[in-house]
From Swiss-Prot:
UniProt topological domain (Cytoplasmic) ranges: 95-117
Biased composition (Polar residues): 27-40
Glycosylation sites: N36, N46, N58
Stretch list, region Disordered: 26-64
Pfam families listed in its UniProt record: Alpha_GJ
Entry's Gene Ontology cellular component terms: host cell endoplasmic reticulum membrane; host cell endosome membrane; host cell Golgi membrane; membrane
Membrane topology summary: Single-pass type I membrane protein
Protein name stated in the entry: Envelope glycoprotein J
Lineage start: Viruses, Duplodnaviria, Heunggongvirae, Peploviricota, Herviviricetes
Membrane-spanning ranges: 74-94
Protein's organism: Cercopithecine herpesvirus 1
Top-level division of the source organism's lineage: Viruses
Function: Inhibits host cell apoptosis. Induces an increase in reactive oxygen species (ROS) in the host cell.
């Protein structure tokens, strides 16, 4: 039973450690400029205005749409979950096989005791 808890705990830990950094990126927070930054992107070297980066007003390209939430890759948690399922299935099959073998051995001992008695 301890191995079952270990397998489930490992899956949960892997899912949490894999999803936590991606969830922080999915919030849409942008990095802030350092406090000692003095560059002003709005003016050029000679005082003229520099156009802002991005698409021009007459461009036909659409604005970028946000990705659906959660925009994370579930490959690692799915693989680990699949391994957990296989492990649990193997544990169940092993327990069933062990039970059947014990019953068969008990029947053999019973027959041997009856024959040689």
């Amino acid at each position: 039973m301890r191995s079952l808890l270990f397998v489930v705990g490992a899956w949960v830990a892997a899912a949490v450690t894999h999803l936590t950094p991606n969830a922080a990126l999915a919030t849409g927070t942008t990095p802030t400029v350092g406090a000692n930054s003095t560059a002003d992107p709005g003016t050029g070297a000679n005082g003229t205005t520099v156009p802002a980066a991005g698409t021009p007003a007459n461009s036909t390209t659409a604005a970028e749409t946000p990705a659906p939430f959660p925009p994370v890759d579930f490959a690692l948690p799915v693989v680990i979950g699949g391994l957990c399922a296989l492990t649990l299935a193997a544990m169940g099959a092993g327990a069933l096989l062990h039970r059947c073998c014990r019953r068969a051995a008990a029947r053999r001992r019973q027959r041997a005791a009856y024959v040689y008695a």
